[in-house]
Amino acid sequence: NTGMRIGEARSINWEDLKRVKDLSVVTVFGKTKKMRDVAFTQGSERYLRNLYDLRVKELKGENPRNDELIFLSRRGKGSIQSFKTAFNSMIKFVGIPKKGINGDRTLYSCRHYYATNQIQKQNANVFILSTQMGTSVEMIAKYYGHLITEEIAGHIGGREGRHITATEKVYPF
């Protein structure tokens, strides 16, 4: 729900979370070690609150330390090295096939799904999307440029699905 990389999520502490206006935001260190803020959806925010409550329960009513990692290993001693087993169990549980159109589904597939959904369904501004995901506009264009649909093309052209008529002939664009 954020488009962040797995390594970025793995290194988040509770103190990295904050409120900006009405949004929950987390500060992450990206692939190039550059710091950026990533906005959470309401679903992600609920999930993090549930994780926090579970951690308080594990700590017998105590709040976790601010510098504690959000995604801890089972023993509570450091970051989870791999989310692979949990991810595979989850997709099996919800009935999603392991094999997708482009090969096996992995946790990184969620990042691609996020970008695809933002472009196709949310008409996301590519500059904002690249900032949220910690990548360049050029990389978004390289990997997701093929997703420009008739709707988006119409939106960009200011015609939004209308046909252009010249004389009596109707053109399909």
Predicted regions mapped to residue ranges:
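Short, basic (Lys/Arg/His-rich) helix/loop patches that form interaction surfaces
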Residues: 2, 38, 56-64, 77, ...
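C-terminal catalytic core of Y-nucleophile DNA break-rejoin enzymes
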Residues: 30-50, 65-89, 106
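Residues in the recognition helix of alpha-helical DNA-binding motifs
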Residues: 12, 51, 86, 90, ...
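Short, polar N-cap/turn motifs at the start of nucleic acid-interacting alpha helices
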Residues: 16-23, 123-143
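C-terminal secondary-structure termini that scaffold catalytic or DNA-interacting sites
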Residues: 53-67, 73-75, 142, 154-173
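Catalytic-site neighborhood detector that most strongly recognizes the C-terminal catalytic loop/helix
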Residues: 27-34, 43, 133-158
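Conserved tyrosine-mediated DNA breakage-rejoining catalytic core shared by Y-recombinases
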Residues: 2-7, 11-56
